[in-house]
A protein has these predicted regions:
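C-terminal catalytic domains of large/alpha subunits in multi-subunit enzymes
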Residues: 1-230
Length: 230
């Protein structure tokens, strides 16, 4: 392999030999981030030179008899600047979203009299590879002049939107908004039954917020889909 630069090319071995001092590779590069320190008068600061952005969506199946939520498909799109290592990017996104799905659907520390009753991996439900849906990591391949080599972070940001994406998908599938995590079967089933009981008692007239849901569902097969997708 040869490294090509502005003044020519050299083999990787030649470059390593030139950069080594006493057998230690010493070629380094520093990137000075454009940040703003804390202003004691305003309390404002900018501790990052570049900010990443992400959006996620999932497709779910909700069993109305058991309350079990199954994620069928997942996509995670990121503005992480220049992706220097595509394989590392994809692995990071898949791993981060797997953690997010675990937090959204099952991970929870349970306590009894102030003591955790599921403190080990024997009884703490982490998702396994076989539990995961297809996860599609995508990058918009932007470039940020403030990031090293135009790159931006793709770390914790993967985990942040996952639970919201799952909760939104469940709400879209059932019409019931659940605002507490994780979305365990008992919690989902309880919310569905409570919603059914309220619907029988009050109907649409007693819950105006559901008029638009019922209207969209009735109009969609009657041509609304074509209007929205023009």
């Amino acid at each position: 392999h040869r490294v090509i630069g502005a003044t020519g090319s050299r083999s990787f071995a030649e470059l390593a030999t030139q950069g080594g001092v006493d057998g230690v590779l010493t070629i380094t590069k520093e990137v000075e981030l454009d940040i703003e320190p804390l202003d004691p008068m305003t309390g404002l600061a900018n501790f990052s030179g570049a900010y990443s952005f992400a959006v996620q969506a999932v497709e779910v199946d909700v069993d109305s008899d058991t309350g079990k939520v199954t994620v069928l498909d997942a996509i995670s799109v990121h503005d992480s600047g220049v992706v220097v290592n595509p394989i590392g990017f994809e692995s990071q996104v898949i791993g981060g979203m797997a953690m997010g799905l675990g937090a959204a659907l099952g991970e929870e520390l349970l306590y009894e009299q102030g003591r955790p009753i599921n403190p080990s991996y024997l009884n703490y439900p982490l998702p396994r590879a076989a539990d995961l849906p297809p996860i599609r990591p995508l990058s918009v391949q932007g470039e940020d002049p403030h990031g090293p080599y135009g790159a931006k972070a793709v770390g914790e940001i993967v985990l942040i939107p996952t639970a919201a994406a799952v909760a939104n998908a469940v709400a879209h599938a059932t019409g019931v908004r659940i605002r507490e995590l994780p979305l365990t079967p008992d919690r989902v089933l309880g919310a569905l039954r409570q919603d059914q009981a309220q619907s029988r008692s009050y109907g649409l007239a007693g819950r105006p917020s559901r008029w638009w849901i019922a209207g969209i569902r009735s109009l969609y097969p009657r041509g609304l889909q074509k209007v929205l997708h023009r």
